[in-house]
Amino acid sequence: MANLLPIDFSQISTYITLAVILILSVVLCMLAYRLMNVVPAKWLCDYDEEPDESLFGTRYIFKQSGIYTSALFAIFNLGIFAFFGYSYYTIFFLLISITMLLIAMSDFKYTIIPDQFTIALAVLCVALAITDLFTQQIFIKEWWSIPLGAVCGGGSLVLINLFSIVILKKSGMGFGDVKLMLALGACLGFPMVFSGLLIAVFIA
């Protein structure tokens, strides 16, 4: 991977690098908790609902779960750095990971994925996909892989939801999950989106 900045990072101590990533992960996690407490309550409601009292005031307390969340977030970011090193991929995935953390926190507590978070994720994913297409081509080899990956990602969840409704007689995932996979599918492209789906199913 080419360095993002014209600086010889090869001489930087590995321990210093790891410390920076760990500290940055904790800071970003604290920022995510802060953002979840200040975003408008309306963001955490369905379109036809009004915020109730539970959405006002403090929604997340860092001391209660922030340490565990920070640890998992740091491990993920260390993995990203180990794979991509000092490159724009690391920066993109760091921004994507913090957005995904906000989505996970919202979905976990309020079972809703705000459109604002999804739009931010989509912008980052498409930007990464286009950048990848014109540079390293790790995920995206052809331009049509971006829209096809998005369609396959979102479409797969639509089919799973239809199967759940018709066969199991109960609703599966919400449309927020479909929009989420549309964004991630654009980032991964076709056919890597299916690998992403398998990983998502395994984690879930």
Task: Describe each PLM feature range.
Residues 1-204:
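A membrane-topology feature that recognizes alpha-helical transmembrane segments
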